[in-house]
Amino acid sequence: MNKKKVLAVALALVATTPSLAEKAIDDSSKVREIDEVIVISQPKEQFLLRHQPLSSNVYAAGQMMNLGVRDLRELSSFVPNFAMPNYGSRYTSSMYIRGIGSRINSPAVGIYVDGAPLINKSSFNYHHFDVTRVDVLRGPQGTLYGMNTEGGLVRIYTKDPMNYQGTDIKLGMGSHGYQLLEASTYRKLNSKSALMLGGFYSGQNGFFRNEFNGQRADKYREGGGKMRFVWRPGTQWNISLGAHYEYTDQNGFPYGKMDLEHNTTANPSTNNQAKYRRNLVNSALCVNFKGNCFDFNSTTSYQYLKDFMRMDIDYMSTDFLLMEERQLQNAFTQELVMKSNRNRFWQWTQGGFFSAEWLKTNAPVYFGSDMNKFMSGTIRNAMYNAMVRSMSARFMRPGVTAEQAQQQAKDMIERQGGVNLDINLGTVPGIFRTPSYNLGLFHESSLNLTERFKVTLGLRYDYSHLSIDYLTSAKMTSLANIMGRKATSSIMSTLQNKAHNSFNQLLPKVGMSLDIDHVGSNIYAVVSKGYRAGGYNIQMFSDILSAELQKNSSQRGDYTVEHDAKAYKDIENTISYTPETSWNYEVGAHLNLFDHKLQLDLAAFYMQVRNQQISVMAGNYGFGRMMTNAGRSSSSGIEASLRGQAFNNNLSWMANYGFTHAVFKEYVDNVSTTGNMKAMDYKDKKVPFIPAHTFSASVDYRIPFNSMLKAITIGANVNAQGKTYWDEANSYSQAFYALAGAHATADFGRITVDLWGRNLTNTKYNTFAMGSLATGKMYYFGQRGNPFQCGIDLKFHL
């Protein structure tokens, strides 16, 4: 079955299911709002998500189990206009919503877990455990949630031990060495307090081998634990303390060389095996008080991250470049929120937010023997050509052509011993301290002008301050033999300085909602502003230092490159990038149809983006990725979501579609072509890494039994996306592709057995691709998507 057949089957399922619902119009099926069924305390919002002027999707634990979702990367495949591709490692957390996204540095999509924000982007990609509900909000959420929610927001909620009791154990195993163990217990200590304790282990041998050393290129092992204590000393108080620890050890970044002509991607083949290890702690204290006129909520969180990454950044078996990165992060956040709790003409929310992040990054770059040979050859050729030009001028005389003069110069150089050069670049160490602080003050009012029509007005003042304190250096030693004369030299460059910057923004929001019937259907329009913080590119320093060394390669003896205030100011301008801002214009509808047997959500949007932040290879040599600002871009599109129930709620189905047209409106960049810099205009080119189309569908049918076997559920799903361009020039891309999955679940009450399969048709596709000039020649690399996999999960509830 090819991908076209997969899509045809999925569309047929979706098309026929509404008719089944109409035929069974007299049954008891109802599609209920998930945030009505799984009630979560919301300290900021006044209304359920489908009664707000925004586009969103909500996923409950049972639905995610049927889809086979284990983390946010896998869930993103079933959310319209949301992409979080599965590539690299847990370090990688690239997320894109509506053409807005980020591969490095400041995120464009925020994540909250049980009401507390995750600060460091390196902590976004983690194992989902004990999750009861996930909300995905599309479009800027800056008024209530601040900077770095320009594309949208993901809210993850875990089980509350006051509402959920018992012990859950989950065992899983599957092909490619997949293993899973999760155990958690939920107990009420008394009528006012409850405790949750849990732990997990997960592992997989991986899908790809490193052709150079035979190791599994993407194997992983991870484990951790969590706790949550809830105390309700009175009817008005709710206090929750939670902590989560996770350790990850994996081989990562299995990027193989691409053949663009034949559209193939090879297995990875690197002489240095890429690795990633991470210790991650997230903790939060939430205090909620329900007063007579208002609710008060305080959320205090602390986050700790310590990781190690090793990446062969030439991505080949040759010994060019190796990068390591060690991050040590401590972060603190505090948010205070008050909101009215009476259903009156005026309902309001207001509060303040503060965060502080202290981040130390140790990021050395190692130059291998092949890089030394490459640099030696490059500089040697430059010296040789300069000597030939200088000497040939002296041989010019009447009757001698320029070619003859050049040949005479070359012959003389060779007779005198030629030009030979051996260079050793060694290691470029780098220690970077980048603390950042953020302050936000916000207010949002909802005015119920009539029974059916309400207006939402919001405004946030957001201030951020960031700084960098860096120490890095590079040394190039050379042994030259020029026409029989030997000379040694050493060129040293040390960069040590501090810089800081501050940004502030006003983030307004204006929304309108109109109820169009008496069953909760409504239409809406909203205008809002998004904001993404600026920052510093620490991976630029290797390129800056290498350029300095090459520029001064003709110096003799021992030479130290000096830097004055102007030089450091130029460096600051080189490594910094400015904030990205956007305006979002959106209209939509939330419709309840056929007596609540069908839900339909529609949205159309247009976004204007200024100073769009784009991840590109750093400078001429490509020693790392850097963030740069494009001039202007725009993004427009649509979203549609359908959910339905039939046959007394035994049949459930959904379908989602998203379309995004994201293009540069003004972006001119200097690119290296055969050693020369050339201005490249990317106007009207598609923004890279953004799928133009996203589609997903699923159907599950539950067959009840009156025996020890309570029910059997059979389900199928499909998700698809593309076309996705991989660079600003739109020179190569991933075509539209589809992945099919299925599962069969047997429910024995306290025991559940689930058989599952993913990528049933073994579709070939890439989740990521890029070009690299690290070796002096442009090569393209990509990571293939995971092939077919199947397995079994056993769940016990005691």
Task: State what each model feature region is.
Residues 31-65, 93-94, 109, 134:
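N-terminal periplasmic "start-of-domain" segments of outer-membrane beta-barrel proteins
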Residues 37, 359, 372, 531, ...:
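C-terminal beta-signal and adjacent terminal beta-strands/loops
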Residues 72, 95-99, 112, 148-170, ...:
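N-terminal periplasmic accessory domains that precede
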Residues 114-140:
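Short acidic/polar hinge/loop motifs at secondary-structure boundaries
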Residues 166-168, 173-204, 208, 212-250, ...:
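Transmembrane beta-barrel wall of Gram-negative outer-membrane proteins
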Residues 209-215, 253-269, 314-321, 364-429, ...:
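Solvent-exposed loop segments that connect transmembrane elements
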Residues 286-311, 522-526, 539, 545-628, ...:
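Membrane-embedded beta-barrel scaffold of Gram-negative outer-membrane proteins
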Residues 339, 343, 349, 353-355, ...:
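Gram-negative outer-membrane beta-barrel transporters
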